Amino acid sequence: MKFSEMSYTRPDIDALLGQCKALAAKAAGAASGEELVNVYYEQSRAFADYSTAAQLASIHYTCDTRDAYWKAEQDFFDANGPAVENARVEISRAFLANAHVDALTEAFGTTCVAGMKNAVLGMDDRTVELQKEYNALVSQYQQVYGGALVEFDGKQLTIPQLGPYKENLDPAVRRAAYEAEAAYFDAHRDELDGLYTKIVKNLNAQAQILGYHDYSELSYVRMNRIGYGPAEIRKFRVQVASDVVPELKKVIELRCKRTGISHLTFSDLPVAFQDGNPSPIEGYEARMAAARTMYHELSPETAEFIDFMQDNELFDVESRPGKMSGGYMTSLPTYKAPFIFANWNNTSADVDVLTHECGHAFEGYVAERDPKVPADLECPGMESAEIHSMAMEFLTAPWHHLLFGKDTEKYALLHAEDSFLFLAYGCIVDEFQHRMYQNPDLTPDERNAVWLELEHKYRPWIDFDNLPFYGRGAGWQRQLHIYECPFYYIDYCLSTMAALQFFLLSLKDHKDAWERYLKLVRRAGLASYTELMQTAGLKVPFEDGSIKAIAQQMGQWIAEHQV
């Protein structure tokens, strides 16, 4: 069914909550392992219509945050979602209390029971009002960001539409584009500072109700991190600082040599080539035709997937006023349909987001069609889900010429560099958030000082050159995740470690790399991050020294492929 034909009905929350009580009773009373497994399948199906309605409302709202009808529907889910989530937790509690709970591990692997334990530890009726308040704060942030329009070059532009100007070869144009963006955020400075103060206090209050010191602890439970915790993430960040940052300095030196920029300032960062960055082919239809060819030639599975996506209008990727910034993939369970949202701005990032979100959507498409996989185990934890997307960016490389033509080699180099450089930025975001929730009384200026301190630690090559907004350390406020889904960022770093390994494997044997990827995808949400890495024969980046060799190989490839 085409997206435009999908009907929306606001769900009956009371009826759903009643159904949840009945399912909890069934889970508690299951008299055998087989019966318990069947109840698990039943409860996972029970939420399909609710989830579909919630996602339809979210899609329509983020596609136009000014639409009063969809704003009201989004408000409805913001207000009622916590009660539904807590009802689901009660079902999990009933499963865990059943004497036959081990049957779920036998049927569905290690993540099922561990995930339910995290759900029980992370939610409680006592936090419902705080959860509602948090959802409302996120919606306020989305309105501030989604409503951003700046006057530039004689036009009214959204934040994503400033992208091409930030890559302009004239440094004055680049800086002016950043200043135009900065002016918008500075105009909303008090609002953004106030929202973040409220978010930190809200989430810390939820954590303390549940017995945690602060939200940085609770986040590991809420993010359903299985098999690792804060100690492993600290080890990872230490390795990035000691083993990756020195290689990244060399990458930056090569880029400066290539571009002829002797002193790198923040507004110079987007420029990767003296004659301009790689540009993808223009036009929605041309790009979609190239994507169809690419995925048809990659594999039979991806051919079926891209036909389904395009034939059913499951892309909204062009930027326009009122549309929320960023990109995402979500699923509409009733229709077994992934949906891709993005903001193209005629830069190479358009191809990044296309292949990235198609990686997510491909995994969702495959999992939704596997009858053995319950709906709530179709997707693994976020650090694992991002492997699907980030690895897909690299595994489609043999077809990038369809999207870049003469700029293909430039894009290959830029993409490898940016993926590698991202590890430093991702660690800044993660360490910053740990510091914020562990020190909730910091003033806005003190928060910004922490951000600048971490920039110097992980990206010492950057000079902010007195740039408004960014120069005072407030650049983190345009990073959606910090407000919308705290601590969902180190996931990108962990998955980048997998994606870089897939890239290096594909250079030796693309067929082997793709088969490993497909094997990983087919495990859906039935395995943890470490198990999925092992499934594909990849190194897990928590062990001391596990990152160094990968960093050196990436540095070497980049040095050998200067354009």
What are these regions (language model features)?
Residues T110, G115-K117, G227, E318, ...:
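C-terminal, non-catalytic "cap/extension" segments appended to globular domains
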